Amino acid sequence: MLERRKPLDLLFPLKGSATTREDGEERQSMTALDHVRAGVMLARDAVKAVSVTAMEALREGATFIGIVGEKNELVDPFEHLDAPIWSDRPPQELTKLAFRYCEELTMREAGNFYHSFKYLPDEQRNAMCAVYAFCRRADDIADGDWADRFPGSQGEMDPEAVAYREQLESLQDQGTILDEEAYLNKITQLFFFRKKLSTCYSEVYSTDPVFLALKETVDRYSIGREVFDDLISGMEDDLYNNRYRSFDELYVYCYRVASVVGLMCIEIYGYEDPRAKKFAESWGIFMQLTNVLRDVGEDIQRDRVYLPLDELEANGITEPELGEQVVLNKQWEPYCRDYARRARTYLAEARQLLPLLPRRTRYSPAAMIAFYDKILRQIEKQQGDVFTKRVKLNKVQKISLAAAVYMRHRLLPAFLDPLWTGLARIGLLPAV
């Protein structure tokens, strides 16, 4: 009979986990049936489902359930349910409530992104908000203090959560950059976050509004699970790495936390040309490279350096200089120019995505690309000064960019698009 701790060890191997020779031999001898048993033990609480009576009561009260609390805080409308799933499809009223929750979360946490969703058809806007809410929650777990509800549990004291935590505590040499308590908390929550993701690809429905809305989204737009798993893996990277030796290492990180989001988005936008996937990957790389440069000053205060270390060394730039802001010297500005030049190679590919998308959905990615292009230009204009103040767009810049994007990608007849491109090259129109 399997030990209580073994299922988590089998189904969720950890980086750098300490194993004995006997453990290795035992794992190699595990049969398919043993793996099934392990899975059953791990997910046993997930068989609990909200009763039909409770579901009907929720359906009747859905129009009265609020998602904003007395102190204007965002409230999970299903937080008092003591079961993790609905075994049957919940009423449409509850799914609509879940989408409302995701939309409110997006408006609160990412006004610029929400603006870019503004002109999408309702179904696609809802889907984009569900995807954003998933990404936001994963990031909040890895990089913030979000306390997620564990499925089939009463939180941290759930037997399976306790068993998993004990298993983690028994492992040695994790190589995490966090203190032990923070690491155990975050890796446990990300594990259960993956469990919730599983409901989106099964016959049950999560009582977490984010995953209820996400399930409807992945079903409607046939989005594969791999991109969501990759994003969670990117969040896990932040628990182990706070330095990247080379651009190749940084690229993998950027792909996991940003490119996969672009790949999710294009399934919602719609496309036929397979090149759209390559350009969506470049779109994510461009945006994340811009984020990395913009946030250098803030990241170094959190003991994180995302810029490739080999490139900093080659340019005579040291970490202490980044932290003390004395890096604003003759080495830093040329490095920033080279960095921006490489980011723009991905920007050029990202822009090739736009003509491959339907006109009705093109504004959304075009606006995001234009905003980040402007941020990168502003960094260059400030000679790479990302230390003394955060680089961001003011309201006038946002409005003017949004108007230009709207005009080009929603109003301008297609046959005039080359004319806009030509005038943008000589500076008579914005390059959006």
Label every model-predicted segment.
Residues 2-288, 293, 297-432:
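Catalytic cores of Mg2+-dependent Asp-rich isoprenoid enzymes
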